[in-house]
Amino acid sequence: LKGLSVIDYFTGDGGYHDAISLQDAVELSWEKAKEKAPNLPKGWWELSKLDPGVKLEFIRDYWFNALPYQPHVYHFLDTFFAGVLEVGVFLAQKRENSPHEAFFTYRLKDRLYLGRPPLLEKEIERFKRSISYPLPDDYLNFFRIHNGFAKGGDSGIFSSGALEEERKWFMQAQEGFFLGEKSVDPELLLPFYRSFGLDIYQCFYKDWYPDGEVGNVLCSLSDRVISSWKEDETLAFPTFLDWLIFYLE
């Protein structure tokens, strides 16, 4: 990413046909921007008009307010946002004549993160009811910030809609997984993240409740194995936010 603008990323490695920086598109009114990108929240459009420093401080505080208080998470987020060079709102168009989509971007020195618009509280509740799985509260709270989030070039954390599709794909493999020599039923696993171009998922695991809610483990679809929390450096995490810290580092 060094030397590349966010626009360059979208129209280059990001594979988008067109991208617009709302920070720079001073001639674009709210009505015109919403017409281009129907999923653009009014708050994001207003945020794009603020000074860069104010915008960064606002979104950092928004993360703090949206997520449950955990000292180590707040400490990490302070460090993460101290390394963010700029945040912005962009409208990106995948194909000519298709609608643009809204993204919130976080640019660091050597990487970029992109988030899609958040869910409303009633949408989070609807999503929770639609999934027959004990979703952790910290994971659900993240949808207040972004409904879909990824490092540039990665598939990333699924949106609520994509999660349903990915789960179907994940469940098509009828064989079970293995945790060491123990067989694990795929029904116990719920994928929430996929590594781009690989059959590597991060999944909630219903048989592991380390902190009162389900933990998450690395799952290899090709090898049919999941990581063990009983060993060091196996990418098994007691909470969604612990995994998110790993992803943002």
Which ranges hold each PLM region?
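Compositionally biased, low-complexity repeat tracts
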Residues: 8-11, 79, 84, 106, ...
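Alpha-helix boundary/N-cap detector
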Residues: 68-75, 130, 134, 235
